[in-house]
Amino acid sequence: METLTTLYLMINRLFSTLLFLSCLFGGLSQTAKAQNNEWENPTKYEWNKEKPHADFRLYERTDDAVNDNPQKSSWQYSLNGTWKFVYAPSIAESIKDFYCTDLSDNDWDTITVPSNWEIQGFGEPIIRNIQYVFSPNPPYIDVDNPVGTYRRTFTVPQNWQGREVLLHFGSISGYARIYVNGQQVGMTKASKTPAEFNVTNYLKKGEN
């Protein structure tokens, strides 16, 4: 019997992220060149992330698999929908203790996931296909980039007990760090590609 279950999440636009599944993730970028920042280090592009694999979905019944309707599978739980969100134009203005489970989000904005935050009124949309919108100086980021901090809660279905749980991101733009219940799970820089993390040991009974 298949022993995996999947939390599906599709994010189409983050510059970078920090996800804390209670659920929170926020975008990170730019600081001084003198610091050896993870997001400016080309040798560090991921950690604690599942290896890439062919796309698949989990189903209990053959008919559901043939029809390929993920909403019919009890082994998948979508996190798409309304999330709490804070936008900051630079890392200096971003939330520093975003991963704390007791951090109140009552005054946060909301955002629809999946989506680009620019088309929901945060930041400025950039449309450019022939050259950079900044002077490239790899691996350093010499200009401020926006930070998006996302959060939402969910409850793990009871029939998932004893199974491994993967958190699946369909797409993230840029650098992302993922947190669950206040604990850092992993990191990815593979922009616009799926990213999965095994969050089994970070979950708890009831609300996460």
Task: Show where each model-derived region lies.
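Bacterial Sec-dependent N-terminal signal peptides
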Residues: 1-36
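Short helical patches
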Residues: 4-7, 122-124, 130
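N-terminal pre-domain segments of enzymes
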Residues: 35-78, 82-84, 91
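Accessory beta-strand-rich segments of carbohydrate-active enzymes
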Residues: 38, 44-49, 69-70, 84-88, ...
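Hydrophobic residues on conserved beta-strands that form the core of alpha/beta folds
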Residues: 80, 105, 150-151
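Short Gly/aromatic-enriched secondary-structure transition segments
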Residues: 94-107, 111-113
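Non-catalytic accessory segments of hydrolases
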Residues: 108-111, 116, 123-128
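Surface-exposed acidic, glycine/proline-enriched linker/cap segments
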Residues: 130-138
